[in-house]
Amino acid sequence: MTLIHPTAVIDPKAELDSSVKVGAYTVIGPNVQIGANTEIGPHAVINGHTSIGENNRIFQFASLGEIPQDKKYRDEPTKLIIGNGNTIREFTTFNLGTVTGIGETRIGDDNWIMAYCHLAHDCVVGNHTIFANNASLAGHVTIGDYVVLGGYTLVFQFCRIGDYAMTAFAAGVHKDVPPYFMASGYRAEPAGLNSEGMRRNGFTAEQISAVKDVYKTLYHRGIPFEEAKADILRHAETQAELAVFRDFFAQSARGIIR
């Protein structure tokens, strides 16, 4: 059985595993690498120095590896790197990185990216995330593991969203969202704990309670942020589920939602 449709346009220099399926009218550029058992639907365009792993499913009209929407970009050989087992739905756009950023845009494994989502230059997306339709990341955004972005979520440049966090429909994320927390609103504010997401991913009642105490410390005790952070970091020394806050606070450039 022919795995590549005869109307697909694939540069001879592109490197595709023999098991890759390519649909009608798809275009694949010379610097693209695609791993085993990845399936690409019709009318997709994959360009740039793009590496795609194994067992991905890319739907029709996806645009992957085009140049970043950055006026400073001067055709440098930056990259897009996509891991394994991802579902990338219709009309998604993933851009290359920039030399003023980390030089690459990275997507991990087992992510579910729904239609019309956009990942700008130098974004880093972890594993097992869900992006609902039309979620968009500006440049230099970092998304942790098991994050859920509601439809039409917009994330500002350089923001971070921590592991197991969740945003509501049309959230405008202008500051960092800590791990396990929910955020909602045009200028996103704290909206409680993603306790259901934690339960679904095997956290115990005791672990959820410990994270709930962190939420209360940050938002309900009425103490200054630096004092709240110090208290959380003390508890993180003995509670493994809180250790993620140590790195998150240390790497936060925009501050957290309040």
UniProtKB/Swiss-Prot annotation:
Coiled coil: none
Keywords tagged on the record: Acyltransferase, Cytoplasm, Lipid A biosynthesis, Lipid biosynthesis, Lipid metabolism, Repeat, Transferase
EC number: 2.3.1.129
Catalytic activity: a (3R)-hydroxyacyl-[ACP] + UDP-N-acetyl-alpha-D-glucosamine = a UDP-3-O-[(3R)-3-hydroxyacyl]-N-acetyl-alpha-D-glucosamine + holo-[ACP]
Keyword Hydrolase: no
One Pfam family recorded for the sequence: Hexapep
An MF annotation (GO) of this entry: acyl-[acyl-carrier-protein]-UDP-N-acetylglucosamine O-acyltransferase activity
Pathway: Glycolipid biosynthesis; lipid IV(A) biosynthesis; lipid IV(A) from (3R)-3-hydroxytetradecanoyl-[acyl-carrier-protein] and UDP-N-acetyl-alpha-D-glucosamine: step 1/6
Disulfide bonds: none
SUPFAM superfamilies in UniProt: Trimeric LpxA-like enzymes
Segments traversing the membrane: none
Major localisation: cytoplasm
Record's subcellular location: Cytoplasm
Entry-linked Gene3D superfamilies: Hexapeptide repeat proteins, Udp N-acetylglucosamine O-acyltransferase, C-terminal domain
GO CC terms: cytoplasm; membrane
InterPro entries: Acetyltransf_C, Acetyltransf_C_sf, Hexapep, Lipid_A_LpxA, Trimer_LpxA-like_sf
GO BP term, pick one: lipid A biosynthetic process
Subunit and interaction comment: Homotrimer.
Reported function: Involved in the biosynthesis of lipid A, a phosphorylated glycolipid that anchors the lipopolysaccharide to the outer membrane of the cell.
Record NCBIfam families: lipid_A_lpxA (TIGR01852), PRK05289.1 (NF003657)
HAMAP family assigned to the protein according to its UniProt record, in alphabetical order: LpxA
Family classification: Belongs to the transferase hexapeptide repeat family. LpxA subfamily.
Name of the molecule in the record: Acyl-[acyl-carrier-protein]--UDP-N-acetylglucosamine O-acyltransferase
Gene source species: Neisseria meningitidis serogroup C / serotype 2a (strain ATCC 700532 / DSM 15464 / FAM18)
